[in-house]
């Protein structure tokens, strides 16, 4: 009698629309289609990493229950429209973006000023409409996250109270909009009691349906790995990334911070925090640097300006940093 469970041998990906696809896998043992299909669906809807606007500051606005002269929408509707903008950040976890527009006409997502490593997936999305003489000036904080996080649940260790004028948004980070699955009958030779799993996925464009399935499957594997070692002990690292060599990084990241020609005070503060290379520096956030002893807002602004002149910003993320063999002085 055969005791080995069948594994899927056929995988088909059918593109239904720009951000919609159907993934078909077969054959499964009877019952496994529903078991795995339901697990994938729940993970896809709840656990995918994405990006969302989390805070907004609008010039001349103290709270969300306001209106702006020359803008057709009130602030509440502007914020609702802003939540529909799909962001994608590369090599960083957060960023603050600016939007400044005046003159009659629509305000689009493409009007948001973005650095080279921030992408707006739906640039034609309408945020507001300006009348003649209207003006809209806002700062938008975008963060990386998972699932849905209400604004009331967010905590700021560096700010015990919410500052006036800063509007905290409910953030929906998930890039997956809809998931459904069906199970049909499959046949292998004489066996007709097998399952075929069809998963239909729609995303917001920040991730493809295929990548979403891969990511959700990896999450399930990581979560289930602990059950294979019920005796106890530490689990082996899952897919630990191989260290990257220095040649795989942008050469500017390997230069010492001394080459930024900062003031002596700023340079000494960075070295006291073991920040020796530009690659070390850009991975720190503004809040982290402000906690550095003797480094104030003036020094922080100096650092930001010097980095901006080289096309860099704070809060960037570098995989496998530092490279192998980099001298930590």
Swiss-Prot record:
Function as written in the Swiss-Prot or TrEMBL entry: DNA-dependent RNA polymerase catalyzes the transcription of DNA into RNA using the four ribonucleoside triphosphates as substrates.
Top-level taxon of the source organism: Bacteria
GO biological process: DNA-templated transcription
Alphabetical list of SUPFAM superfamilies matching this protein: C-terminal domain of RNA polymerase alpha subunit, Insert subdomain of RNA polymerase alpha subunit, RBP11-like subunits of RNA polymerase
UniProt protein name: DNA-directed RNA polymerase subunit alpha
UniProt keyword terms in alphabetical order: DNA-directed RNA polymerase, Nucleotidyltransferase, Transcription, Transferase
Sequence segments annotated as region (Alpha C-terminal domain (alpha-CTD)): 249-329
């Amino acid at each position: 009698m055969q005791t080995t469970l069948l594994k899927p041998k056929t995988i088909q990906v059918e593109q239904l629309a720009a951000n919609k696809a159907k993934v078909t896998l077969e054959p499964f043992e009877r019952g496994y289609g529903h078991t795995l299909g339901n697990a994938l669906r729940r993970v896809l809807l709840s656990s995918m990493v994405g990006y969302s606007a989390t805070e907004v500051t609008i010039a001349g606005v103290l709270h969300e229950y306001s209106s702006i002269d020359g803008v057709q929408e009130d602030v509440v509707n502007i914020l609702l429209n802003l939540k529909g903008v799909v962001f994608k950040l590369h090599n960083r976890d957060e960023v603050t973006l600016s939007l400044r527009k005046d003159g009659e006409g629509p305000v689009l997502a493409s009007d948001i000023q973005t650095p080279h490593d921030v992408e707006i997936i739906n640039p034609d999305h309408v945020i507001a409409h300006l009348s003649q003489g209207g003006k809209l000036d806002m700062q938008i904080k975008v963060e990386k996250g998972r699932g849905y996080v209400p604004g009331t649940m967010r905590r700021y260790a560096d700010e015990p109270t919410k500052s006036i004028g800063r509007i905290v948004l409910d953030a929906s980070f998930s890039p997956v909009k809809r998931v459904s699955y069906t199970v049909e009958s499959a046949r292998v030779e004489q066996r007709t009691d097998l399952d075929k799993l069809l998963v239909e996925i729609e995303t917001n464009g920040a991730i493809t349906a295929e990548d979403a399935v891969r990511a959700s499957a990896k999450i399930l594997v990581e979560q289930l790995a602990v059950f294979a070692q019920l005796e106890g002990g530490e689990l082996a690292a899952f897919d630990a990334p191989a260290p990257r060599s220095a040649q795989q990084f942008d050469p500017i990241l390997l230069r010492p911070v001394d080459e930024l020609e900062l003031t002596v005070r700023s340079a000494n503060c960075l070295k006291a925090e073991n920040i020796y290379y530009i690659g070390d520096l850009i991975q720190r956030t503004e809040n982290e640097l402000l906690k550095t002893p003797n480094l104030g807002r003036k020094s922080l602004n100096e650092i930001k300006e010097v980095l901006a002149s080289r096309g860099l910003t704070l809060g960037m993320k570098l995989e496998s940093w530092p490279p192998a063999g980099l001298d930590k002085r």
